[in-house]
């Protein structure tokens, strides 16, 4: 199963008016040579980014304990990690919910 990413839209630069861009042909369909990443790859990349964000927050916190980072850097890193973790949990909940819904379907 192939899921085309946002890059498959081939957006042309415009003045920022989406309706005008659409009317003038600013959005082109994906071509056969421009296949997006698979769903598994997209989920894997998102998980990797989340883990990297959490590790960065941990490193910045340790640097602050050593006196190498200020409070603002720690707060920014921890808030970013919290947001990434909340997003990952929300996605997990949606996937589990979808799985349960599909499993209840009759064949």
UniProtKB/Swiss-Prot annotation:
GO cellular component, one term: bacterial-type flagellum basal body
Family: Belongs to the FliE family.
GO biological process: bacterial-type flagellum-dependent cell motility
Location, primary (coarse class): other
One GO MF term attached to the UniProt entry: cytoskeletal motor activity
UniProt-recorded name of the protein: Flagellar hook-basal body complex protein FliE
Localization in the cell: Bacterial flagellum basal body
Ion transport listed as a keyword: no
Key words of the record: Bacterial flagellum
């Amino acid at each position: 199963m192939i899921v085309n990413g946002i890059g498959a839209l081939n957006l042309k630069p415009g003045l920022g008016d989406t309706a005008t861009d659409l009317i003038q042909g600013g959005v082109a369909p994906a071509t056969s040579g421009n296949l997006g990443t698979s769903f598994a790859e997209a989920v894997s990349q998102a998980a990797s980014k989340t883990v990297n964000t959490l590790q960065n927050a941990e490193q910045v916190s340790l640097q602050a304990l050593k006196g190498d980072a200020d409070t603002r850097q720690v707060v920014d890193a921890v808030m970013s990690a919290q947001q990434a973790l909340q997003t990952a949990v929300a996605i997990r909940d949606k996937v589990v919910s979808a799985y349960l819904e599909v499993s209840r379907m009759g064949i």
